[in-house]
Amino acid sequence: MGYSLFKVDKSKYNNKKYFGMKKLILLLLFIPLLGFGQDDSSESEVIKEHVVRNEFSIKITDLSNIESRKTESEYSIIVYKNNEVFQNIITPANMSYHPFEERSFGSADINFDGYDDFLFIDYMAMVNYSYIVYLYNPLSEKFEINEDYGSISSPQFDIDYQIIKSFNRGNAAYYESEIYIVLNDKLTRISKTIDNYQSNTYKYIIYDGKKEVHVNEALRRVNLYIGFFKTKKFNIIIDLLDNGKYRYASWSVSRNLRNNPDLILKNGVKQESENEISYKFKKGEFSYTCIFNKLTNNGHLKVFQNQKELLQQKASVFIMPNEVKQYTGNKHKVIISL
């Protein structure tokens, strides 16, 4: 039994005109049905590309009463979302006095999630300084104070590598430097260097994916610690040198990382495919390759003599997030108004 959109009296269609009109009506009814359920690619592309970016304006007013000789600073910090009052930021209680014009109020994507955060100077000495930090929460769309980031000494936020560099100068002969990343939404220190020229002692500490470990201090002069490969026989550290090449340092698992490495290779190169990252090194007729699998987060060590494979071992791997996924930000806009 056929189905019709309309009930039709066939007696009215006994001549060609009616049959012609019938065909025209059916054609007009049928054309829209052809497009029903089909994807209009041009319209879909527009929808996919359309991204709503909120604009936040933060208005800051100094309410400190200098004449009262109070030792605290007091500010009014109002957040406007798309030109409407949205949040009143509360500053820490008993915030030590610091000149308003030297607070360096600003915004930056501190935790590299694509959203700008809000910060200003908390403490400043002759060399070292720290920030009061408010991270943007994309769920509540509010700026929330975070003491972990505020505890970092003299931070520098490096978007290119998605790292936070920290510097602390104790005196003219004592220096500390640290590097932090955001790992599983948690601030994580991945390296620390201590240079004490007065006592002639030096330390180099790295994060191996589970814990911090002390490493031979001669390896501390690097641009960036990249990753740690652990096989059943070897512990391997991959570093990025100042010349843009990679360094391979390897120890037998039975040896302490504070000892000199069994093998150091420089001038390494990085190669990347859709699912893998490889760090390749050569020494004469031997080549060493550390492979990280993006899908499993594990890897392999492969050793070749000329083209012959001598060794292949599975490895647990810690690797810098930026090596796997580069920064993509600019999800909203923050304007500071004083």
Model-derived segments and spans:
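Structural motif
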Residues: M126-I132, Y174-E178, Y246-Y248, N298
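Blade-edge motifs of beta-propeller repeat domains
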Residues: E74-P99, L139-Q156, I164, S191
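Sec-dependent N-terminal signal peptides
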Residues: L24-L33
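Beta-propeller blade repeat segments, especially FG-GAP/WD-type strand-to-loop junctions
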Residues: Y80-N82, N128-I145, I179-N184
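Beta-propeller blade termini
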Residues: I47-E49, F100-I110, I152-K165
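Central antiparallel beta-sheet cores of small beta-barrel/beta-sandwich binding domains
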Residues: Y136, I226-K282
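Acidic, small-residue rich beta-repeat scaffolds with periodic aromatic anchors
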Residues: G37-E74, Y161-K230, N275-S278, K283-F286, ...
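Acidic/hydrophobic-patterned starts of short beta strands in beta-sheet-rich repeat architectures
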Residues: N111-D122, I164
